[in-house]
């Protein structure tokens, strides 16, 4: 199988979307690929595993590894168990009720440094890149859409800056109430992307303090936690006026005609890390062969998802639509997973990189991606005081375990399962990234210099305490 070429995938996207929406339930009858590249029988120390997940499109590698037989090829009998929210999922892994899980990219990092429940967690595999969007209610859309720059086709020009919300923020403030948005968890990429987008548009999302775990100190807008599947209903009820979430819950708002996605996260930070495979360090050390087998199976699933110019995506849509996985309508899942993204009825745009599972080294747990998560924790006060660059780098490398990923991936290369060029030759730090919506360049080797570039956020020398934010 060839790794997905994004241009060819884009060309095929319309046909894939139509096929998925038409209900191609029968297109997934092919047998799991067998090539002799498996974990030797009896090698795994713990063959029966329970993995947790949240009902989101990006749990796809877990579902595909099970449904296409990749777990079984590696000697694993895996039960996939949906969790009510990210806190329940995290507690399940820490408490041992779950062996591993589909986790937010920031969860293992936050637990390791003691944000919330302290635990020694690791991420030996990145599950995907991109996959989120920010949606607003029809009420907010009606207020901002007339003022948006339009293209020759009459559709809004993208990306849309958060600055368009400034008049809305002021209107709510004049009425004595805050503009409220939802996000999925305090240490989620969704939270940090939403905050980044707001701050880039001149809107302060607030600081976290020991007495303000909601992170609203100094905020122009109020952010609160809502579990992903509950986002559309919470928006429809008027409890929130917008949210940052993964799919299919932005597309669900479009289908229900209750909201409009303003921006996809690849327009905030291209190829950003989204979910990881999370587990305790103790699990990986106690069951090393099992951990390797688990990573191998998921890499195979990631390759399947991005292979042959996206040809497998319609089948993946049908699998994810099942009630034991995401449980959303297939056409809603397909609206973001097959090379295009629906912003509004009649506004469907090419989005070949909305979900990346295997291409662009999506599985490799880059330390620089973990450092970025840490910088945002510091920027908004979850990390109370300055830390040296070395602390950021050492923490990132201790949690994002590229060594475990490489052991599994290089074996798959040697066996001819994945191409050698799909595994990066790297020290774990990407080159300086310049594609952020605000144009600020990010060098993962220099986190403090990066933090100093922002107009909104904690400054060098500032710290947070119960009494508030100290001056720099």
Regions found by a protein language model. Give the residues of each.
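Bacterial lipoprotein signal-peptidase II cleavage site
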Residues: 27-35
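Short, glycine-/small- and polar/acidic-enriched structural segments
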Residues: 36-224, 236-237, 241-254, 258-271
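N-terminal secretory signal peptides and thylakoid transit peptides that target proteins
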Residues: 1-18
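Ligand-binding clefts/hinges and TM-proximal coupling segments of bilobed small-molecule sensing domains
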Residues: 19, 150-189, 193, 293-339
